[in-house]
Amino acid sequence: MDAMPIRFDQCLSAWETQINQNIDLIELMIPKLSKLAQGGTAIGTGINAHPKFSEEFCKEMSNLTGHQFKPSDNFFSQLGSQDTIVALSGHLKTTAVSMMKIANDLRWMNSGPLAGLGEIELEALQPGSSIMPGKVNPVIPEATAMVCAQVIGNDAAITIGGQSGNFELNVMLPMICENILSSLELLANTALILSDKAIKSFVVNEDQILKACLLYTSPSPR
């Protein structure tokens, strides 16, 4: 929209802030994710398990992975519900929403050159259309948008799985696990590709920007 002028570094700072905020929220989940329910056995009482099983299991996991794990504060809660994973998924969904917004901004900026904004040129990663010579499709932002839609869908499934616990048991753990791991992998890989193949390599069309009517808004008399 032809409104007020804004610099490209200001646009990029907004994207940076969105992503950094999401990273901070995800990192806050790490201490909660480090508490494991192993040793609670079927319903959290620890029946038929050695009294030190949970503690020893966490020590072994810490040694194997290099991350510090601890026994759950409450096995009954952690076996019957998956609130921590639901919360993590919510933060991943928010990250996906932010990334989709960035991808859509790139698509709009790249639109044109005649019937669109034409403010930037994305790197041509593959041939465009055989019937429209010179057309460059924003394939990375488009792929990013699809991934983000999938992560948002995964979050919906995880939410349903989390609320499906009955008393001290939740039989939807395999589905929850599949979707949270999928969301983590999809977002991690896509964030790198979006950064390397779209954001780092786009070229600003200065001539096109200088023709924008919005540049005349700032010096206009009040």
Regions found by a protein language model. Give the residues of each.
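Long, amphipathic alpha-helical stalk/connector segments used for oligomerization, subunit docking
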Residues: 150-212
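Internal glycine-rich alpha/beta core junctions
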Residues: 4-158
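Conserved small/polar residues in nucleotide/adenosyl-binding loops
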Residues: 216-222
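Glycine-rich cofactor-pocket loops
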Residues: 1-9, 38, 116, 120-123, ...
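Short coil/turn linker and secondary-structure boundary residues
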Residues: 49-52, 204, 219
